Amino acid sequence: MRTQGVEVESLRAVDHAIATGVWPDMTEHGWERDDWPAISDRVLGADILVICTPIWLGEKSSVCTQVIERLYGNSHLLNDAGQYAYYGRVGGCLVTGNEDGVKHCAMNILYSLQHLGYVIPPQADAGWIGEVGPGPSYLDPGSGGPENEFTNRNTTFMTWNLLHLARMLKDAGGIPAHGNQRSQWDAGCRFDFPNPDYRSPSSAGAPAELPVWVRERGPRGPLRSDSPANRGPHVRSPT
């Protein structure tokens, strides 16, 4: 990434006093010290987040779990468009260890990131595992990790896909702000979600009629020009 002019910052979680909990600042909930608020500011200032973890007993480490929990503790924050604060950012993960579990760890980490609002590009995970049992770690001399063709290929593809998608989102101004704004939903807007109060046919025992654009689209046909997907952005007034 640095060779492409990207500013890269590495942060080792165990070097910081990150309190356990799911509030933005755990000093407000009994902890004497919590470095997370400052770390969170750095995370929110980045367009790309790559979470790295070793494998322990086939799972991501407890430290990695703690970091994800603290990320989740900030998931209530909104951006200027009323979307969740992590929108418009991309995420990936790197996993190392001496036992199987790279894909299992990546599955959990990438799911967690997308649930928070991150966009996950194709092949956004890479990893390396040594021989089964005790042995050298990735950076230890003679591990073979830095020379592994499979690991290097996946790391390269992940890097470029993160860069491509981050650039696409940056150029587009992030994820379009329609149908995904928590602030608007809380204000009563429903973005064309059917209001049960108007489903009078179903109350009489007949199935509710589908909107015209759904009925005429067909299972795989193109959207009609008057479908919501083809209209310009709009927000309904609260009713």
Question: Where are the predicted features?
Answer:
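Phosphate-binding/catalytic loops
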Residues: 96-99, 139-143
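Short, glycine-/small-residue-rich phosphate/pyrophosphate-handling segment
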Residues: 80-131, 150-153
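N-terminal beta1-alpha1-beta2 submodule of the flavodoxin-like/Rossmannoid cofactor-binding fold
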Residues: 1-81, 143-226, 231-239
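Short aromatic-enriched loop/helix-cap "lid" or pocket-rim segments at secondary-structure transitions
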Residues: 20-24, 106, 134-136
